[in-house]
């Protein structure tokens, strides 16, 4: 639950209503939020869990980006998907062992992932490249977007989905931007700036590893945030607001 004026704040109530209607009122729906909503949901985000979650988002973004740049051109059908499965299993073991989520460990792992995908035999031929931008649920959920990625790939297109980490940084940035626009506690602005600097360091390492392996790598978030200036206010944040404009310009 984002706590904003978007649908994400209300999904949980719709899910509970649907479960009751389907005859499963005993099934709980836990909320992940940083807005003080659903305090008794039974799910609490701790710092160690947050660090692992951020690492998973970085790894997931990289795997998706590399998979989508290899799959349309692979000589052996399914090779890219098998590589994704291999790394998901490998990273899962590492994270469960309490490793792999520090900045140093991620920066060490990124080039290894990129190298493995670059080793997949491909035949590069011209294809239509389609970028997908949208509200967070519709962009990533096959159910929400009518399985858009599968359809585009069936039309022999290369699909580009901007990563989830961009949305995470967007949410953090907005907390600091609210201080600039409306005032509030300076500590919030300072805290968000420090967190964004840490995320930027890891993100740039991921993008460098991607580019060094011969793949397309978008600009980091700190460059992305500059793109919509003069087109839309950075205070426009409902429905992913200025982020959608920035991603369209980037693509």
Task: Kindly label every feature range from the protein language model.
Residues 1-251:
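An N-terminal assembly and electron-transfer interface module characteristic of large anaerobic redox
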């Amino acid at each position: 639950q984002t706590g904003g004026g978007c649908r994400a704040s209300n999904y949980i109530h719709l899910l509970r209503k649907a479960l009751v209607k389907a005859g499963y009122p005993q099934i709980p729906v836990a909320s992940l939020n940083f807005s003080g909503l659903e305090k008794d949901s039974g799910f609490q985000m701790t710092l160690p869990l947050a660090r692992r979650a951020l690492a998973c988002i970085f790894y997931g973004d990289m795997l998706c980006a590399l998979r989508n740049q290899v799959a349309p051109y692979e000589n052996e059908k399914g090779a890219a998907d098998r590589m994704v499965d291999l790394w998901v299993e490998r990273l899962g073991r590492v994270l469960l062992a309490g490793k792999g989520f520090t900045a140093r460990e991620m920066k060490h792992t990124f080039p290894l992932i990129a190298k493995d995908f670059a080793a997949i035999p491909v035949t590069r031929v011209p294809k239509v490249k389609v970028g997908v931008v949208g509200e967070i649920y519709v962009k990533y959920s096959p159910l929400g977007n009518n399985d858009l990625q599968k359809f585009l790939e069936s039309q022999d297109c290369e699909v580009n989905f901007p990563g989830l980490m961009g949305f995470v940084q967007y949410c953090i940035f907005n907390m600091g931007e609210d201080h600039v626009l409306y005032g509030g506690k300076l500590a919030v602005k300072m805290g968000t700036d420090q967190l964004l600097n840490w995320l930027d360091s890891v993100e740039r390492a991921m993008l460098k590893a991607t580019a060094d392996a011969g793949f397309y790598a978008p600009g980091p978030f700190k460059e992305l945030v500059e793109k919509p200036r003069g087109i839309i206010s950075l205070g426009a944040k409902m429905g992913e607001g200025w982020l959608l404009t920035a991603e369209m310009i980037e693509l």
